[in-house]
Amino acid sequence: MLNSTGELEFSNEEDAEIISQLTSLALSDGKSSAGAPEKTGYPDSVYVMAANIFQGIRIEKSAQKVLIKYGNEPLRSFSESEDQSFQRLSYELAFSALKYQDILETILIDSCIFPSTTIPDRKFQTRVLSDNEESISEVQEVENLLNSFKIKLAAALARCRIKHDALSIYHILPETVRKQELRASTLPLYAWINTCKISPEEVYNNLKRRGYNKVKSVLHIDDKVFAVDQHCYDVLIFPSHLKNDLINIDLFKDYKLIFQDKSRSLAVHSVKALLNMDDDILMVNTGSWYTVAHMSILTNNNTSKVFVCGVQSQAKDPDLKTLFTKMGCKNIEILRETFINIESKDHRLQKVKVILPLPRCSGLGVSNPVEFILNEHEDTEFLKDHSQGGISVDKLHILAQQQYEQLTHAMKFTKAQAVVYCTCSVCPEENEAVVKKALEFQDLGNKVQLYRLSPPVLPLCSLKEIQLSTDKFFRMEPSEITNGCFLSILTRERDPSETVSVKDVLARAAAKGLLDGIELGKSSKREKKKKKSKTSLTKAATTDNGIQMKIAEFLNRETKASANLSETVTKPSLPQKNTAQVGASSQTRKHKLAPHPAVPTFMKNTCPSRPRERQTHFIRPRPEDRMVALKPIEIVLPPVFMPFSSPQGIRSRMPTQHLYCHWVAPKPLVPTCLPTPSLSRKGEKPKDDTRSSLLRPPRRWL
């Protein structure tokens, strides 16, 4: 009743029906804008469950602003509360009551009615109960009381709409809340394929047999259609109005298709892209167990383990094991400790290479908070922030600090090579600011390499996604086709000592029986090609060694011949280093050489005393010489001094000269040989005395 301070006080039994009527009003007035279906009432047990939920999440005001006092004792629950459909309806009722709490309290005070409620959608008609529905006396009593005050309630609602200049009660809500409801009405359903139990092609064929058609986009389509997600190959998209039809088919009953928000699929696919065959994964704050199962199924063909921390209650073990068994997950290991309490050197986590923290966040990127709470097991406090369209600065600071602590702790695991950080928030304080702060304050004392920001590993499917990812962060803004999310990948270079070759990976897989039917003994075409090239290189190296020996022998002969002809002291023969350089270049050149600026352009036969031997060598090569493919090469010999003058005199009068030789035979025996420049001069006869041409001093006027 009303007390001296003008406050209203009511019990929890009345509170239940208040929430019911409030929800009906919200759905009725807002159905044209948000697209919500018209509802004619719910079972009594749904009202009771919604009252208990509302009691825990309602907005408490200061003592000076309190208009209505709410009860503190929860109502007794019923067996139907375990049913998921009842839970969804109850959360929807409670969330609607929370959004309209201020308006309803104003209407209740203005109409002078004792219980806190609103106008029903049935226009004050009696609610019809089904035959198999059990009625609750407290709910019936409150409903009768509301019907008796219908005129006063209608007048109070009209005055409230005039005061706010609103067409309906829906338009009194903040604009952010209205946009959120509009997105939620068109948001499609996302479901990932359990590839341990069924292949994507089998799912497509099964759906087609049931009348579903595969399309590129399901937006604004009322038929039975589905599409494949562009970011995750194992995720299907369905229109939201098909959920009641889909949950009753065998694909969902047998855990072959699992409904889940797309942001979680993006996170596990990012982790999968960073894994090797035998790398383990550590997951933090997973929320829904479907996220763990999805990660396990993606790594089913590997030898990886999926560690999940923070499961403190052992009572959940039987249910979890049953769930994972039904889904075909075999590589999941649950840790009892919270993530912050796990040491970075824990012996169980020495093979963990990728850590996936999914910290608790504001979730302001989520369009349908009720579905998110039910699917991801979030706290009901999640609804309080969404009902107001924002979050307080103090609470945002607390969440950001928790996220920073989890991220920095993940970066302390020295064996880990990557951290995938994911939230469902659109607040920079929870996303970019946390990641940049963690990178800035890394522990420089560790000998391991530091983390750095890496670009997204997911495909960027539109120009907008490319623009949003220019700073190496993957973002998805809330829209009519998806919830908002944030994804960041931190990596560091792998330790070179831990680098594993492809052959080692295949050998491990074969030892564990993962490559049944695949012959590893057969070398691939690429390996054969490499072996062939190595063999040819070996043969070429052997041939080059033989050529080097022949060139060295030739140079020795030329040096001895020059020593016998000249009486002056000449320099030693070509050093071994030059010989090696000549051999490394392959063969002597057969074509005309570029003239050296300090040497006259005429051919020199440096061994005139043995012309017959040289002719025989070039005209009739040995069989093994024919097998060698000769290549042109330039040979530089040491300076040759004239016998009629001293070396000092020559050095003082002329620059250092070098001889450039071609391997050609003399003209009498090889008529096809190129003529020497000295013989090509007009009117000059060839000279048979090769020695005289060798000893002739250079003619500077040529």
UniProtKB/Swiss-Prot annotation:
Which segments show compositional bias classed as Basic and acidic residues?
681-691
Q: Which residues form the active site?
A: 424 (nucleophile)
GO biological process terms, semicolon-separated = RNA methylation
EC number, as in UniProt: 2.1.1.-
Q: Per the record's keyword annotation, is Transferase included, yes or no? A: yes
Q: Where is the composition biased (Basic residues)?
A: 523-534
Show the SUPFAM superfamilies listed in the entry.
S-adenosyl-L-methionine-dependent methyltransferases
Q: What does the function comment of this entry state?
A: May have S-adenosyl-L-methionine-dependent methyl-transferase activity.
Q: What is this protein called?
A: Putative methyltransferase NSUN7
**Chain's gene name:** NSUN7
